[in-house]
Amino acid sequence: MKKFFLASSILSADFARLGEDTKKAIDAGSDWIHFDVMDNHYVPNLTMGPMILKALRNYNITVPIDVHLMVKPVDNLIPQFAEAGADFITFHPESTDHIDRTLNLIKECGCKAGLALNPATSLNFLDYVMEKLDLILLMSVNPGFGNQSFLPTSFNKLREVRKKIELNSSNILLEVDGGVKLENISEVAFSGANVFVIGSGIFGYTDYNVIIKKIRKKLKNVYSTSIH
């Protein structure tokens, strides 16, 4: 397994050429695709449904797709996204009455399960479900829109979650989403994240190869420092 994973957030891609733009990001070195689903109810925006995910799979997008459900209620959409081709499905604790049951549903559908925490959401939600998690997603902005600035309070929260993961001797992936870019990715990585959701920090550039190469160089330096 790689030390770090880049998940290109297609919320920032060119929707008129979504398949092509997604493929360009992958060819430039993106490991995953991050797929944001918003319902204009749980969050104040409306984005993509299962048919868009299925269309990407039909376009020969084969890398892991990380579906982030910002919807309420959430359970009825999980089988649809699993069938459409999701690898990871992540939801927010506020979107369900039974976190444990929703995690079980994701697993039953054949996907890896994640829990997403907003900037002001307590980490206590993790305490009784760690053994069922494959991924923890920390939001470093308030969800709903792309191209926001990284909230500095997220650094401490990342460090706290990393401690929880290590105390459980777990292989849970720690993902961060919101305002991650070339200028701050080193500090984000040093704080404990190993999956980085990047939207405008990749799609906002003309040449994805150049920016991803620069990001990889920063992460390589973090890795080299951390093993010495």
Curated annotation (Swiss-Prot):
* Cofactor: record remark: Binds 1 divalent metal cation per subunit.
Q: What class of enzyme is it?
A: isomerase
Q: What does this protein do?
A: Catalyzes the reversible epimerization of D-ribulose 5-phosphate to D-xylulose 5-phosphate.
> Which amino acid positions bind a divalent metal cation, per UniProt?
34, 36, 68, 177
Cofactor names from the entry are: a divalent metal cation
Q: Does the keyword Metal-binding apply?
A: yes
Q: Where is the active site?
A: 36 (proton acceptor), 177 (proton donor)
Q: Could you say which residues bind substrate here?
A: 9, 68, 177-179, 199-200
Q: Which named protein is this? A: Ribulose-phosphate 3-epimerase
Annotated GO molecular function terms are:
D-ribulose-phosphate 3-epimerase activity; metal ion binding
Q: Which pathway does the database say it acts in?
A: Carbohydrate degradation
Query: What family is it from?
Result: Belongs to the ribulose-phosphate 3-epimerase family.
Endpoints of the signal sequence: none
Species for this entry: Buchnera aphidicola subsp. Schizaphis graminum (strain Sg)
